[in-house]
Amino acid sequence: MRSTLLTLAILLSGTFAVACGDASSKSDEEVEREEIQVMLETYLPLLAQAYSTGQYSALEPYAAQKEISSIHKRVQDLTVQGRRLEATLRSVTIEDIKAWNYSNAYVTTHEVWDLVVHATGSDQVLAEEYEQPNRVKYQLKRGDDSWRILFRQIQE
């Protein structure tokens, strides 16, 4: 009887250890999701500001130079067309995260934006769309305990 109780105690402690191990890995995933959510909630208003002002330096802690260069090109293309974009982020929700090797991730988000296109150099409104939903795919890289955007693409 005593050996049965000892065996049962060992089995229960092993089950508890395995359960705790699974809980901590889920906790790591939740922490990762929160880190990415906070980063995107910080970055996206700065992205909107870059489109409005043409100032990109605030993006540097969050996006790789290649991504900043592609944003710069899009803003230049709008300028050539005589347009300036004023964007306001309404919400961002992470739909999916596929992470690998601790330092890489693909993230899919659902973002809602208010977009107003002005004629360059004036407040004349050329187009406006409020509460525009977008599904966006990001490629992220972790470095120095923070995530950076390597690539951002609107899916729909």
Label each PLM-derived region with a short phrase.
Residues M1-L8:
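Bacterial N-terminal signal peptides that target proteins for export
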Residues I10-S13:
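Residue-level signal for mature regions of secreted extracellular proteins and peptides
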Residues C20-I68, D77:
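Short, low-complexity N-terminal intrinsically disordered segments enriched in polar/charged residues
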Residues V38, T42, L46, V80-E86, ...:
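Repeat-unit-sized solenoid/scaffold elements
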Residues E41-T53, R90-T109:
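N-terminal short leaders/motifs
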Residues Y56-Y102, V117:
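Short solvent-exposed beta->alpha transition segments
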Residues Y102-E156:
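Exposed beta-sheet edge and beta->alpha loop/turn motif
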